[in-house]
Amino acid sequence: MLIAKAVAVTLLAGSFGGLTASPSGDAAAYEKQTQLEAKRVACMTERGLDYLASPEPRYTWQPGEQERLAGDLEALRAYRAKYGFGVWSANVYPKDEVVNPVQHENPNNKMLMSLSAGELKKWRAADDSCFSQAVKEVLGKTVTSQEDYHNQLEAAVRKSLSVLDQDKRLVQLGGRFAACLGVSPAEPTALDGLSHTKIVRQASDVAKKAWKGEPPKAPKGKTVIFRPNLKPAHARPYLDKEIKAALKDLECGKDFYPAYSPKAMEITSRVYQEFGREGAAQAIPSRIYRTLV
């Protein structure tokens, strides 16, 4: 993650649909992740390179979180009344783990920082090769690198969620949702997260103005999103506007979310589990913020 004095930078992908809740298959998926990490260790050791297993820790749910992701209006309203969509609230409540969860630190970071540029390049090439081999052995999937793995995962999610755009009831509810928001008619998967995305982009515009020097260029097909690093008092007015937008979005989507979210939840979780990841724990951050630079 690239942290500047003003902002942190994030890549934004095109899909913003389908947040997930914790399904029974998560335990099996987590076991696959553990197996995959063990094989990476063995492969790197065979090549004479260091690697410490680094599975993501099991996800800890916040009170009301699963209900929100399943489209529960009361839980959504309680969250949005304080945090909005969770964008500016991260600045206003810097010590609140609801919007600033503790980040998993990769145990390999210290070792990687000690490598020269040439050694790091060699290590990353070997790691991608070992990762791809482990994915094939554990998941039966063919990938060429970790980036390719994540790209395939996101593509699989988008493809699987597209069935919801053919759901006549969701299309009808989505039409009313869009009309209430004052936006052009859109597919259900495009409506889920639409208002949230607007706030993310607005925050990015504010943060970009504070960027020192030449801003980073986005890889092809992605957009660079700047994350603000404002003090709570400076971020508060932005959060107030975000809360207003989030509550309006919920009022407009009061029929849409309870119908759409449970289906999107099940689909997204299933795909993530197929890729050896806890459905909810891994899918939640990926919907809006795709890959940290």
Describe every region a protein language model picked out:
Residues 1-21:
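Secretory targeting and sorting signals
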Residues 17-293:
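Cell-envelope/extracellular polymer assembly enzymes that use nucleotide-activated donors
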